[in-house]
């Protein structure tokens, strides 16, 4: 019995083993691996085409040094996309609704882009804290604001992904519960509510794909500033 709407976001366990580990391993089992054959199947061809188009669009503004990140970000994109889509299926735990997981992905990758900027172009990286032509009276305030803006980036990355997916799951839960309650009393209203639930589910599919893309896009923009 569900005691709270947020019980669906608690990490279940089986025989003392957290099921979040199985949920994190599931995308790597579902995504087909390329083969050495001349002619691959349709799924592998579609996957290769999608990754190639995504990588070209994402790394076109970056210089050659930033292209080293292409395998990592493309793999992370497929990983997040698969987790988000699987989370919309019934009785499947969604790891990306956990802020700890999202921050665990956002903070190290953001920190890596900052350290790369400090190593490759320290003058340019430190110049973001104090733009040229700043009045002397505003220098301390501006440095504090730029520092806060820099350190809030990974928090915004993790919270954005968590909040969007959590809100969508809660809405689906509420509307589906309303359909079951209204079905015996007002069937017509229940059918209309079910249609609304179907439209909301389609919207959540789009949100799941968009949020995975936005997460990687923002990381690439942070990388573009420092590479």
From Swiss-Prot:
GO molecular function: proton channel activity; proton-transporting ATP synthase activity, rotational mechanism
Catalytic reaction(s) noted: H(+)(in) = H(+)(out)
PROSITE patterns referenced in this protein's UniProt entry, alphabetically: ATPASE_A
Membrane topology summary: Multi-pass membrane protein
Cellular localisation: Mitochondrion inner membrane
Domain of life the protein comes from: Eukaryota
Protein name: ATP synthase F(0) complex subunit a
Organism, scientific name: Gadus morhua
